[in-house]
């Protein structure tokens, strides 16, 4: 009896891996309230028990080495609707993404719900029809494009709970190595497009050159995404960095390049559908297929001029929920947007105990460290909202104002110090918004409000704390990367009045800033 018991336990463990191997069931983290109840998901899809670490299947074929059949969607019903993507590369692993979906679209498929149910209730059955047939997807990673030298492979399930998205971590890879990958519907010839990705160098590896493409601000109705496609076709970079505003939430009436939904987006379905529309752009799809992406969000992934407690068009009052938000609160809207973002983007679970964390760092050998910040949504003090701009100008130097919150700020400063001490030559900082002081009086400012208080200029104490960290520890070779303004800015990083800076030679500066124009 003992061998049989071991076999059954092995089946159970494999079945668990097939479900939990799809990171999106727990995204953005395994233990906070945006994750799904796996007990309910498993029960609905044919599993009789969930004990936390083991699944006991009604059908042993679910967990055998062969392709599962009973209760699963037929391969002929499914399509890889939005290509493939990879992201958040490490020296030994990378995130792989795809979507394997039937041709259905349900604008009621909101996992976050309305009414008097608890805020974090994710039970779907009470509100919408959901599929009881999961999709089984396998993946393989190879050193050659013919997929003949597979070095990592696995299987994962997906379902309507997570918009049929699949996100897995391919492990056991070698540093600074190019790989090819492909998904397929289990037990069939229904395959995804072939993707390509690349791991990062080992932290102490000597690397002479790493090429990155840096993007921000891509608004689908306002132009084609040629910038993505040109770099992909030239094929002369290693990775892609996106600094935010990957989508825009606005209502649009564009007929030449319509986006779905056409109204301003608020619900989980809205955000899923909007990202899905963007991913139909062939240049964007090609870039995702060719390169590993590292992304963060700015404001428009959720809503314009976002901060900790609201947005320019929606605040934390019941009247605003009803008048401006289609009955959707600030917290609800943020949950919807964050969940859709983690479902659709090739991004890792960053922190298992942090509801909104996207800030993280990457090491590219001894050449540079990349620090990706969230200067927008995590714990930002109030920003300019249109009606309060002059008031915010009066607060520019207030010591308590922060773009990041104390937790992220302290982490950021520690990252700078650790990077310098480990001997990394450069530090790249993805900060979304422009860091350097810019007088915008002749642009769209005024004599009374001469600075863009929605950028770092509106949070002078936070800027000064950043510069103080750099100067106190002698941390130079810092490169700030920014988007948001839709304009190109290049400047030295200088703590004015605290350093002997020469604008002719650049001496006294601790780095430079490159703020790029928009994709569209």
Predicted regions and their residues:
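Metal-dependent phosphoester/phosphodiester hydrolase catalytic core
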Residues: 18-520
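Fungal secretory targeting signals
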Residues: 1-20
């Amino acid at each position: 009896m003992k061998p049989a018991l071991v076999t059954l336990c092995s089946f159970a463990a494999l079945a668990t891996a097939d479900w939990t191997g799809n990171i999106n069931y727990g995204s953005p983290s395994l233990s906070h309230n945006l994750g799904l109840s796996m007990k309910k998901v498993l029960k609905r899809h044919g599993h009789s028990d969930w004990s936390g670490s083991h699944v006991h299947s009604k059908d042993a074929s679910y967990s055998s080495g062969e392709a599962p059949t009973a209760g699963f969607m037929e391969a002929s019903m499914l399509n890889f609707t939005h290509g493939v993507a990879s992201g958040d590369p490490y020296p030994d692993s990378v995130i792989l993404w795809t979507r394997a979906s039937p041709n259905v679209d349900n604008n009621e498929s909101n996992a976050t719900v309305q009414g008097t149910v608890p805020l974090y209730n994710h039970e779907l059955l009470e509100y919408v029809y959901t599929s009881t047939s999961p999709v089984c997807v396998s993946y393989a990673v190879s050193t050659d494009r013919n997929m003949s030298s597979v070095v990592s492979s696995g299987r994962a399930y997906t379902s309507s709970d997570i918009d049929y998205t699949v996100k897995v971590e391919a492990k056991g890879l070698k540093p600074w190595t190019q790989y090819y990958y492909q998904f397929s519907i289990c037990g069939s010839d229904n395959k995804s497009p072939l993707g390509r990705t690349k791991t990062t160098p080992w932290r102490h590896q000597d690397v002479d050159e790493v090429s990155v493409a840096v993007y921000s601000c891509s608004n689908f109705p306002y132009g084609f995404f040629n910038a993505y496609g040109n770099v992909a076709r030239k094929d002369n970079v290693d990775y892609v960095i996106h600094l935010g505003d990957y989508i825009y939430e606005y209502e649009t009436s564009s007929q030449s390049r319509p986006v779905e939904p056409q109204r301003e987006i608020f619900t989980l379905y809205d955000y899923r559908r909007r990202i899905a529309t963007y991913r139909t752009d062939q240049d964007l799809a090609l870039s995702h297929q060719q390169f590993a992406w590292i992304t963060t969000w700015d404001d428009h992934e959720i809503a314009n001029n976002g901060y900790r407690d609201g947005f320019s068009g929606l605040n934390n009052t019941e009247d605003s929920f009803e008048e401006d938000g289609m009955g959707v609160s600030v917290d609800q809207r943020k949950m919807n947007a964050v969940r859709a973002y983690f479902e659709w983007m090739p991004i890792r679970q960053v922190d298992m105990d942090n509801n909104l964390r996207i800030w993280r760092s990457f090491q590219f050998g001894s050449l540079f460290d990349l620090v990706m910040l969230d200067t927008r949504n995590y714990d930002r003090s109030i920003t300019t909202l249109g009606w309060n701009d002059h008031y915010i100008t009066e607060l520019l130097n207030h010591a308590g104002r922060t773009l990041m919150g104390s937790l992220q700020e302290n982490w950021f400063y520690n990252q700078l110090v650790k990077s310098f001490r480990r001997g990394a030559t450069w530090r790249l900082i993805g900060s979304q918004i422009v860091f350097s002081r810019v007088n915008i009086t002749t642009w769209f400012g005024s004599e009374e409000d001469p600075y863009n208080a929605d950028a770092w200029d509106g949070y002078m104490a936070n800027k000064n704390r950043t510069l103080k960290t750099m100067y106190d520890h002698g941390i130079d070779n810092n490169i700030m990367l920014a988007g948001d303004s839709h304009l190109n800015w290049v400047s030295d990083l200088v703590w004015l009045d605290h350093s002997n800076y020469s604008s002719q030679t650049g001496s006294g500066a601790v780095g430079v800033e490159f703020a790029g124009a928009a994709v569209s």
